[in-house]
Amino acid sequence: MAEPEVIHSWSAPRSLSTSLMYSFAQRLDTEVVDEPLYASFLKATGFDRPYRDEVLSKMECNGEKVVKDVIYGSGSKKYRYCKHISKQRLFGLPSELMSRGKHFILIRNPLNILPSFEKVHPPSFLELGLGELVSIYSDLCQMGTPPAVIDADELQRDPETTLRGLCDDLEIPFQASMLKWKAGPIPEDGVWAPWWYKSVHESTGFSSPKKYPRTFPLSHYDLLERSLPLYNILRSHVKHSSSLLSSPLPPPSLPVPENAKLLAWVGDEILPREMAKVSVFDSVVQGGDSVWEGLRIYKGKIFKLEEHLDRLFDSAKALAFDNVPAREEVKEAIFRTLITNGMFDNTHIRLSLTRGKKVTSGMSPAYNRYGCTLIVLAEWKPPVYDNEGGIVLVTATTRRNSPNNLDSKIHHNNLLNNILAKIESNNTNAADAIMLDKDGYVSETNATNIFMVKKGCVLTPHADYCLPGITRATVMELVVKENFILEERRISLSEFHTANEVWTTGTMGELSPVVKIDGRVIGDGKVGPVTRTLQNAYKKLTEDSGVPIPTYQEP
């Protein structure tokens, strides 16, 4: 008799592990072993079970002998499938248990495990074994053999695709016989089967998931909170091969691929991109109740940091935020986020301050009793517009909010007014959309302030209907410094159509020349001399000023 190739299945209880064992038992080339380490586990831990004495009398209790003779002993078939429960991997077992054979991990959402487990045995964190599952995954990765991870939910919804993917990972051929079995027990069942395997014995294959879940027992809520993070760690390594389970949309490509692995500040901690989330009870989710700023980093310095913070805190005060973090706390969060990411140039920060988490859903700020939520999202992001060749604008039918309704001087996150205009520009492949005020005069674009030049005079709309941008104010100062005439007044759309030069301003895009509006070519269709002069002056200002980032050293 030859030594079979051993396949190790590691899981928590109530994770369809027995159904999967039955599946492998249908293969003509595979023998299965049901929890060979169980007796060793019961003897070492002293855990009580209704069948404890029977297990100890009928199974090998010596862990070393189990590994040597039961798991890796000789056999009559090509493969030996060993079903393991993760908590049964105790310290002191021979190292070859993990170093030999092929391993995979089967996971299931604790939200589904706990109601099922409770029907047979009181659950606990140790009994679930999710911590040990993470440890098993880590140990195998450390050995250079990261295991495949499959999710029981996928196994239920699309058994064939999931099993084919698992067989590919294990480098064994898939067999269609794995999809069905006869109802009733099999000879390989452990002696505990009458307590745990009732539903499997009634099945003839992987049952489809129930349309609606069981009511979750609130007595296990704390256990769920402790267990879910561990489940999510393992779930992030599942390969979603099933078309029924994967997103109907293809994975999007990021504008800057390096941003796939950024770190963001949320609340009071720095988190990886996919973990950087706010509560569903946060005000920004409940009603866009938040203020924000955009900042840009140039060669180790944050440009106009103090001015942006002034506006952030003014906006928070205008919205009557309570328990606002101190200015120095916000600065430290910005610095720590940038330093942790190693972002010292070509970086844009989206700085948000929400009213915070609510005790219950609803718009009333009276429900906000946790204090504000601070978010620092730093990304590698060059200017988003074509500042060399110029951009095209269209005029939106959506009018800019009147201060009678919502004052644009509050830099708030409720951007639907702007987004509706942006949709119009997207539909025409324009960079942005000009927004008019209620009387038909130009206010700004959906994302930027706007300037024009006519007969040597620089004009920009007054700020009654637009956000008085930090970049706008900076450029207005540069206009005067460069000895151009500056006029701030109401400007009609036709004046922009017939301007000699037009540009937009904003932290995200800096100074962006406009070469066409609503199909009308601006000037000669090229970047004008006033625009270029101010672009150069702005660039020099970003090089010469800004708040230094601690620890930054020039290359």
UniProtKB/Swiss-Prot annotation:
Organism: Arabidopsis thaliana
Similarity section: Belongs to the class-IV pyridoxal-phosphate-dependent aminotransferase family.
PANTHER family: AMINO-ACID AMINOTRANSFERASE, AMINODEOXYCHORISMATE LYASE
Source superkingdom: Eukaryota
Protein name in UniProt: Branched-chain-amino-acid aminotransferase-like protein 1
A GO biological-process term: carboxylic acid biosynthetic process
Gene Ontology MF annotations: catalytic activity
Pfam families, sorted: Aminotran_4 (PF01063), Sulfotransfer_5 (PF19798)
